[in-house]
Amino acid sequence: RGIPLPHMETDFLQLRGKTILVTGVANRRSIAWSVAKVLEEAGARLVFLFRSPELRDKNLALLGKGNAETCVCDVEDEAQVAGLAPWAAENSLVFDGILHSIAFANYSEGVRPFHEVKKRDFLQAMDISCFSLAALCNALKANLAENASIVTLSISSTKMAAESYGYMGPVKAALDSSVVFLAKSLTSQVSPHIRVNAVGASPLKTSASAGIPG
C-alpha cells in the first residue's frame, strides 16, 4: 500500500492571477469566448478588447453583469491602436498574455476565384487579420510581462487551396509567418522570454465561419 499523499490542488495552466488581453469576442459562439471561459476558470484576470462601443455593449451581459474590464479599439485605426499604451499605463495593466482572435474578409459578393480578388478587399483582410497582431504587440510592448505569451488563432489549411475559404487562406498563411518573425523581434528587442504562437484550428461552427460561402 502506498503512502497517502496530502490533497494538492493542481494549477495545470498556471494562469491564476495572470492578466490576459482577449480580442475577437463577437458573441457566445466566438472561439475567443470559449478560450476566455477557460482562462477565467483557471483564475486569470481578463481584459476584453472590442472593435466598437456597440459591439462591447452588445456583449456586456455575456461578460457578466457589466463588471468586465473592457476597452475599445478598431485595429484599422492607427490612432486608436497607438492609444492602447497610455490606456494600459493609466490602468496599471501589465499583460501576461494576449489572445489575438481578430479576422475579417469581405465576402459580400461571394467567394471569387483568387485571381479576381479585389485589391481593397485583400488588403483590408490582411490589415485586420494579420497586421493587427504586429500592431497590437508593438503598441503594448512596454505593457508586456517579461515572459508574456502571445497566441493568435490561425487555420489548419494554409498549405492547401481550400477554395471555400477564399483569399483568407493566403492571409492566414501570412499570419503564420508573422508569428515567427514576431517571436524573433520581440525576444531580441523587448524580452528574451516572450513567446508567440499560433493555434491552427480545424473548421468550427462559429459566427465567423457562417459567413464563409460553401
PLM features: what roles do these ranges have?
Residues 42-58:
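Conserved glycine-rich Rossmann-like NAD(P)H-binding loop of the short-chain dehydrogenase/reductase
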Residues 63-79:
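Rossmann-fold cofactor-recognition segment
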Residues 65, 212-214:
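A short C-terminal helix-loop "cap" of Rossmann-like NAD(P)-dependent dehydrogenase/epimerase domains
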